[in-house]
């Protein structure tokens, strides 16, 4: 298993229920595919450096997890097709 870090920015227009639902969906995707979440941190709503989809703010979430590469690829695929995800980044943090 490898260590990964992902940060994603959710649309500020989402309701609290929608936002929590997306966060749980991403967490469950990792766990159900044999990964484990080692750190989870919601940074909350922050101002963006530049407009993304004409939005000046975004809701930031940071997660560290251990899994094999197929889980990170599936997570990236889900980020791409999910409405409400403005930006995302997944990096491998193996040392």
Curated annotation (Swiss-Prot):
Recorded GO MF terms: small ribosomal subunit rRNA binding; structural constituent of ribosome
NCBIfam families recorded: S6
Similarity comment: family membership: Belongs to the bacterial ribosomal protein bS6 family.
Keyword RNA-binding part of the UniProt annotation: yes
Keyword RNA-binding attributed: yes
SUPFAM superfamilies from the UniProt entry: Ribosomal protein S6
General function of this protein: Binds together with bS18 to 16S ribosomal RNA.
UniProt entry keywords in alphabetical sequence: Ribonucleoprotein, Ribosomal protein, RNA-binding, rRNA-binding
GO terms under biological process: translation
Domain of life: Bacteria
InterPro entries, sorted: Ribosomal_bS6 (IPR000529), Ribosomal_bS6_sf (IPR035980), Ribosomal_S6_plastid/chlpt (IPR020814), Transl_elong_EF1B/ribsomal_bS6 (IPR014717)
Annotated GO CC locations: cytoplasm; ribonucleoprotein complex; ribosome
Protein name: Small ribosomal subunit protein bS6
């Amino acid at each position: 298993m490898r260590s990964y870090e992902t940060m994603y920015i959710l649309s500020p227009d989402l309701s609290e229920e929608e936002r929590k639902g997306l966060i749980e969906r991403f967490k469950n995707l990792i766990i159900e595919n044999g990964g484990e979440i080692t750190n989870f941190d919601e940074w909350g709503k922050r101002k963006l450096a530049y407009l993304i989809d004409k939005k000046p703010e975004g809701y930031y979430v940071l997660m560290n997890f251990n899994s094999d590469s197929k889980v990170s690829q599936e997570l990236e695929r889900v980020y791409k097709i999910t409405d409400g995800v403005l930006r995302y980044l997944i990096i491998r943090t193996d040392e």
